[in-house]
Amino acid sequence: MTLDAVMKELAAKGSESIKRTYLRHGAPEPLFGVKIGDLKPIQKKLKGQQDIALDLYATKNSDAMYLAGLVADGAKMTRKQLEQWASGATWHLPAGCVVPWVASEHPEGFDIASKWIDSPKPLVAVAGWATLAAIVTITPDDGLPIKQVSTLIDRCVKEIKSAPNRVKYTMNNFIICCGTYVAPLADKAMEAAKKIGAVEVDMGDTDCQVPLAESYIIKSRRGAPVAPKRKTTRC
């Protein structure tokens, strides 16, 4: 499929009600309002078409950007391309979901994300923390830089309450993922969650809430010391 053909199919699947929901959650124009489930058949058609994925993200259309993240292979992206995706995120969904999907697959993902979290641009920092959360979720513990992850947990405890709005949300999620999936740091992450407590984030005109890290970790472990690693964070 060509980029033009994909965009036409996305437009045809758009819904005004879904679009209004996305706009209420912070999405900027342009977008069509395509249900996530309706993107999956298109994703199958585009499997392996890396160039189309890159072109889709570059459109700045929220539906196309989400589809790009479903199609792209992060391991095949260059560091420059990942930087472009992070800096090009138009709102918290591509920054907190799409970019982390691909960045977490890259062999230098941890190093890249560790730099993003220091960015003065909130959406880039969101991409950084969300990528780190994705990495600890899918990477075997023996493949993680445990000391660095431990230091990041300490940083969250110290800085989360003063961080920018959506950055707080992703830092909280990083703590949740460490407590849920990283056995060597599970207890430390739980203690961090207790210290942090409730995190206040302005979620706009939505009913969305920030999960309480301590209770969410317990729920996610399902009675086990930690939950099994996930194969991917894409959804």
For each of these PLM feature ranges, what is it?
Residues 1-235:
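Alpha-helical scaffold domains
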